[in-house]
Amino acid sequence: MKQFRWLILCTLIIFLGSCRTITPQYDYQELARASVRLDMDIDRKDNHALYVESANWLGVPYRSGGISKHGVDCSGLTSAIYKKVYRKNLERNANDQRKKDCRKVKKGKLKEGDLVFFHNGKKKKTATHVGIYLKDDKFIHASTRRGVTISTLDEAYWKKCWLSGGRP
């Protein structure tokens, strides 16, 4: 009888122990560093992996066709971040990402992780630049002059060149 009770007790412990929910563990020091580097407050509801990965790319120089921390272009940056954070492969060209990987999203409906597309003024229906929307009208992208940087959709240049938002 004692063996039977012991068996029941062990079974209950194993069963009840496996029912608990697991909350993801975050390295809060890493989040704090990302918050400082990005100059943004990162909340509990935010996608922490997106902000940490974005901070890791900040300052990487621009290189046409690049997709590494030695040099990256705009679509290479979005591809690399999406692969790491969302485990999703994106096309390697801004216009292909817009047409093949995304459904259109209005500027006022952008959510964290959406792609933001811009034209160069010559071909107003062709995406020539892409970034990833973070929050508060800020997005990360690879600038030809400044490398990987954070910009605001409210800046005159980006307002003028806005094409669309996209949700992969």
Enumerate the predicted regions with their spans.
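Bacterial N-terminal signal peptides that target proteins for export
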Residues: 1-8
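C-terminal motif of bacterial Sec signal peptides marking the signal peptidase cleavage site
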Residues: 14-18
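Aromatic- and glycine-rich peptidoglycan recognition patches
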Residues: 20-42, 46, 104-106, 126-128, ...
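Catalytic cysteine-centered active-site loop
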Residues: 37-38, 60-112
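Extracytoplasmic/secreted envelope proteins and their assembly/folding machinery
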Residues: 47-51, 55, 75-79, 110, ...
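Gly/Pro-biased beta-strand-loop elements
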Residues: 50-60, 84-90, 162, 167-168
